[in-house]
Amino acid sequence: MIKFTLQWAVLLGMVMLNTLESKAQNSNYMYRIAKIKVDSSQLENYKLALQEQMNTAIQLEPGVLSYTVVADKKDPSAITIFEVYANQEAYQSHITTPHFKKYKETVKNMVTSLELIDTDLLARVHQKEY
């Protein structure tokens, strides 16, 4: 329970920093949390594959708006990714791209569990640049 609470506290802290935006302003955005457990012996390889996929998606897909990735300090193989897409269609397009398919194929034997959580934005605050 403590680990779960810590992960949520970290995510909330990352998205709540300075300027409040209402849900209505971003009503089409898709916010997803991916909770991933990685085989600890494969963690470095996993991080490389994830970084490559994220960089490519951000460069090539205008509908992929943001990735924030955190690891549990007590269990670095417990990874949480906060993903933001322009809309559901952008996400559906994303998961059909060659770079996403390459990522999934590369990490299929590294990931021991995956939970995807679709969320609704309640509030978002941030510094203009951080």
Where are these regions (language model features)?
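Short glycine-/small-residue motifs
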Residues: 78
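Acidic/polar helix N-cap motif
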Residues: 39-42, 75, 87
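Glycine-rich beta-strand-turn "strand-cap" elements at beta-sheet edges
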Residues: 4-8, 16-30, 68-75, 104-130
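N-terminal targeting signals for Sec/Tat export/insertion, comprising classic cleavable signal peptides
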Residues: 30-60
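An amphipathic, aromatic/His-enriched active-site/gating alpha helix that lines ligand/cofactor pockets
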Residues: 52, 56-66, 84-118
